[in-house]
Amino acid sequence: MKYQVEVIINEDRDKVSRLYVDMNQMPLWEKGLVEIIHEEGTLFKTNSKGLMVFSFDGQKMPMKVSVEKENLPDQIIQIFEVPGAWNRCDSHFIDFNHQTKWVMDVEFKFDEPHDIPLERFIEKTKTSMHIFKDFVEGKLN
C-alpha cells in the first residue's frame, strides 16, 4: 500500500528538519514515546538503526527504526517495523515562501492481509504530521 501526504508548516525548512530529528524534543510531539535506543550508528543518520519505545495504557511497544537515507534539510527516509508490519516514510522538506512544505511518500507492507481502508492510514498519517506541525509552530501545550 502506497500513498502521499503533505502539510505546510509555518516555519523555515532548517528549523523544521532540525526539530524532526531532535531526539530530546521528540517525546513532546511523538505521542507515547518514552525511550529512544541507538543500536547501530547515530540514530537518524544514514544507515543507522535503533528502537523507539512507546508506552500505551501501560504497555511498552518497541518499534524498530532504521534510516535508509538522511540528507537533511532536504530529505530523510525512515523505515519503521513492528511485528507484522513494515512502514517506509520518505519525507521531503521543501522551502515554500518562508514556510516548509513537508511531503511524505508512505509505503506499508503487512505479513497478513488486513481490512483497514487506505483512508484510515492516510488520516492517521496526516494527524501525526499535524501534531508535529503544531509542535514546530509552538501550538502544543
Language model features with spans:
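Intrinsic-disorder/low-complexity, polar/charged segments enriched in Ser/Thr/Lys/Arg/Asp/Glu/Gln
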Residues: 2-6, 49-51, 62, 75, ...
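Beta-strand/loop substructures that line and gate deep hydrophobic ligand-binding cavities in soluble
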Residues: 79-134
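Generic structural detector for well-ordered beta-strands
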Residues: 6-10, 37, 53, 66, ...
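Beta-strand elements of well-folded, non-transmembrane domains
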Residues: 11, 56-58, 69, 95, ...
